[in-house]
Amino acid sequence: MGIQHKLDVFIVSENIAIKDANLLNGDSYGCTIKLKLNTKKSVRFVVLLEPEWIDEIKPMYMKLNGVSVDLKLDYKDAIKRIYSVDLVLYSDSVIHLFSDTDERYTCEYPTIKVNMIKKYYHVQHRGTTCVHIESPINVSDKYWFMKRDGWYVDRTHS
């Protein structure tokens, strides 16, 4: 079998969960999200990475229309990393989330299209993943990024 990290991306403001966006094998993870909009929009992304091992984990990076964006590492423990970012978008945009820049891996990342005008979304390119989209975001998934008293809810023993 091989190494596999689990990657979920939540577009909180649109109530969309992009699940299992990780490659089927290997320690490279990421996806491309194409957003269609016709007006200024505030968008919150939460990225949940569940590594298979804890020795060394590649950091997650984000680009918005080719420009680097700082992802905030909100939470880190042995079984998960939670990143977040709030963006203000003015027009159609492309988000790249990635751990690698090597094209051998990035060409296998999935591509998801989200039409914020028509509230429509679909997987344009699956890559070598089992990516799927859920909307609305499952209540149990929301616990991954809900805070209670300033701390993320610990679901390790749920």
Swiss-Prot record:
InterPro entries the record matches: Poxvirus_C7/F8A
Q: Which GO terms describe its biological process?
A: viral process
Protein role: Plays a role for multiplication of the virus in different cell types.
Family the UniProt entry places it in: Belongs to the poxviridae C7 protein family.
Protein name as annotated: Probable host range protein 2-1
